[in-house]
Amino acid sequence: MGNGINKVLPDLYLGNFKDARDREQLARNNITHILSIHDTAAPILQEMTYLCIAAADSPTQNLIQHFRQSIAFIHQSRLKGEGCLVHCLAGVSRSVTLVVAYIMTVTTLGWQEALAAVKIARPCASPNTGFQNQLQEFQTGELQQFREWLKEEYKENPFNDEEDIRNLLTKASTEEDAELQNN
């Protein structure tokens, strides 16, 4: 139905609008929570738990204002052991920006490393320049406060997200080096 969802971390997936309607794909990945961010975001499947954010794919659209709510929604879903799909229309810009902000908050990675990891999991990932600037602004501004808030709010973090992301980056780098040597 859609292009297929991509697993970024355990119980965290990226996809597009069509993927968010694909019950078979959602069930296969134990997805019970959907974070929908696009112009006309609204709940579609009754059996899902939704966070819907109306936002345009425009460099001037402020996504930072939605980071805390999005991060909490994703984290709560994962803590329950339930999958969370984050999607916009194409699964390229808005949804990727929210997932990068989440990764930055649950790890020590900056926005560029977090985005590089997401691109490995979902090669079409490409936030518009305005969203990239907002991620950079988040990194130099509120990120540390968000990390502290997450620790205070949810106490223990049972995930190995930092290790998972660094392994993903290392694996991709090793594969790239091997490919260069073979050519």
From Swiss-Prot:
InterPro entries: Dual-sp_phosphatase_cat-dom, Prot-tyrosine_phosphatase-like, Tyr_Pase_dom, TYR_PHOSPHATASE_DUAL_dom. It is found in: Cytoplasm; Nucleus. Keywords: Cytoplasm, Hydrolase, Nucleus, Protein phosphatase. SMART domains: DSPc. CDD domains: DUSP22. GO terms for biological process: signal transduction. Pfam families: DSPc (PF00782). It catalyses: O-phospho-L-tyrosyl-[protein] + H2O = L-tyrosyl-[protein] + phosphate; O-phospho-L-seryl-[protein] + H2O = L-seryl-[protein] + phosphate; O-phospho-L-threonyl-[protein] + H2O = L-threonyl-[protein] + phosphate. One of its GO terms (cellular component) is nucleus. Belongs to the protein-tyrosine phosphatase family. Non-receptor class dual specificity subfamily. Activates the Jnk signaling pathway. Dephosphorylates and deactivates p38 and stress-activated protein kinase/c-Jun N-terminal kinase (SAPK/JNK). This is Dual specificity protein phosphatase 22-B.
